[in-house]
Amino acid sequence: MEDFVRQCFNPMIVELAEKAMKEYGEDPKIETNKFAAICTHLEVCFMYSDFHFIDERGESIIVESGDPNALLKHRFEIIEGRDRTMAWTVVNSICNTTGVEKPKFLPDLYDYKENRFIEIGVTRREVHIYYLEKANKIKSEKTHIHIFSFTGEEMATKADYTLDEESRARIKTRLFTIRQEMASRGLWDSFVSPREAKRQLKKDLKSQEPCAGLPTKVSHRTSPALKTLEPMWMDSNRTAALRASFLKCQKK
């Protein structure tokens, strides 16, 4: 799985995910399913934001090849992927500027057009189950929830999917591609089933020679995925370096 992640995802995303896991005492080389899940979630957040702008009239537009002279503002503020302090600073700034209610938990995005925070979910299970879990945790009608699955299903608050159909289709296609690539390598079943993943993990650990500095016990703490990472982009070109590798995995 680790090799797959490094082949399939942009190196910047891999670096962010590695830093998040190591900060919480988790090893990407051991907890490879979590490694893959964090990379996937971060990539979906980028894709959700990518190409969406607000013009000088306040209208939402899609621009795939940017005009440097255009007065455009990113429609979405990416909160996911920043270190925790910076993320809360951004959230507080948005709340002070717009008057929206401050969320109890760090959301993933802010939508300047709809004036609401967004929580993005990517699940290997039934979308409605994961949606209810998210809603129960957040306990706020102000934060919009949008869940995607690897099977092409999605669920959003009040069936409001925020993005146009084509933009959502890009995300669904990417997730389906990840699933197919995992399946072709025999990785999908263990990625979906925690029980199978634990069995595979024990098998992998037994096959490894003892290594200095390598944790011998897997951490089961839940890390707030990517919430404590350093900000990697702060201007209008923040997603440009990632776009080329978003749509498909590298060939095996």
UniProtKB/Swiss-Prot annotation:
Domain of life: Viruses
Gene Ontology annotations of biological process type: viral RNA genome replication; viral translational frameshifting
Sample GO molecular function, one term: RNA binding
Site annotation Important for efficient shutoff activity: residues: 202-203, 206
Residues flagged as site, Important for efficient shutoff activity and nuclear localization: 195, 198-199
Cellular compartment(s): Host cytoplasm; Host nucleus
Active site as annotated: 80, 108
Leader sequence segment: none
Keywords of the record: Decay of host mRNAs by virus, Eukaryotic host gene expression shutoff by virus, Host cytoplasm, Host gene expression shutoff by virus, Host mRNA suppression by virus, Host nucleus, Host-virus interaction
Pfam families: Flu_PA (PF00603)
Similarity field: Belongs to the influenza viruses PA-X family.
Role this protein plays: Plays a major role in the shutoff of the host protein expression by cleaving mRNAs probably via an endonuclease activity. This host shutoff allows the virus to escape from the host antiviral response. Hijacks host RNA splicing machinery to selectively target host RNAs containing introns for destruction. This may explain the preferential degradation of RNAs that have undergone co- or post-transcriptional processing.
Free-text note regarding domains: The probable endonuclease active site in the N-terminus and the basic amino acid cluster in the C-terminus are important for the shutoff activity. The C-terminus acts as a nuclear localization signal. The C-terminus is recruited to host protein complexes involved in nuclear Pol II RNA processing.
Protein's recorded name: Protein PA-X
Organism in which the protein naturally occurs: Influenza A virus (strain A/Duck/Hokkaido/8/1980 H3N8)
